[in-house]
């Protein structure tokens, strides 16, 4: 239960801010729970179906607060779901930018990933999911679990690290200072 007498300190792992169009929404300890709805394009043939989902979500009386675009197919920016959410809905737009990278031999290009993130942030995405904690130690510990990896994006980061034989940092840690400077 939330205690009103507890002092909440922003940016100390209690509260963070999400961009919602031209306003900032505070989320975290002591704030209302936000509801996230997932959409995404895995096949180009599903584009119209996913657009209909957004239209149906817009008609809901008690809709979500956030719409996350989990697309794995990169399309023209103006047609992308995250862009439509930013420009045509009242919802916070969220993405998983690593899904849109074109890996070569399962290696992720940090410049391409950063370019995707910057483009999305510059055009109004309020929340991006990153996987900076994946490392060799976590990989070894996860191998003992029945389901070692439960995150598609985390799995992509891990695969990149394995191919690089854990030499160097996780792809997100390499570009984290730039991500923070744009955020």
Regions found by a protein language model. Name each.
Residues 1-183:
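Alpha/beta enzyme core
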């Amino acid at each position: 239960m939330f205690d009103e007498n507890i002092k909440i300190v922003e940016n100390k792992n209690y509260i963070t801010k999400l961009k919602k169009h031209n306003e900032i929404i505070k989320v975290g300890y002591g704030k209302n729970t936000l509801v996230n709805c997932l959409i995404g394009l895995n096949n180009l043939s599903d584009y119209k179906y996913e657009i209909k989902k957004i239209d149906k979500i817009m008609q809901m009386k008690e809709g979500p607060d956030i719409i996350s675009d989990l697309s794995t197919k990169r399309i023209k920016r103006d047609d992308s779901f995250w862009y439509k959410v930013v420009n045509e809905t009242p919802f916070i737009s969220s993405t998983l930018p690593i899904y849109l990278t074109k890996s070569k031999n399962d290696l992720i290009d940090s410049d391409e990933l950063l370019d995707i993130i910057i483009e999305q942030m510059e055009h109004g995405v309020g929340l991006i999911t990153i996987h900076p904690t994946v490392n060799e130690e976590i990989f070894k510990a996860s191998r003992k679990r029945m389901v070692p990896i439960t995150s598609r994006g985390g799995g992509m980061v891990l695969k990149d690290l394995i191919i690089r034989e854990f030499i160097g940092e996780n792809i997100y840690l390499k570009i984290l200072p730039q991500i923070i400077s744009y955020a």
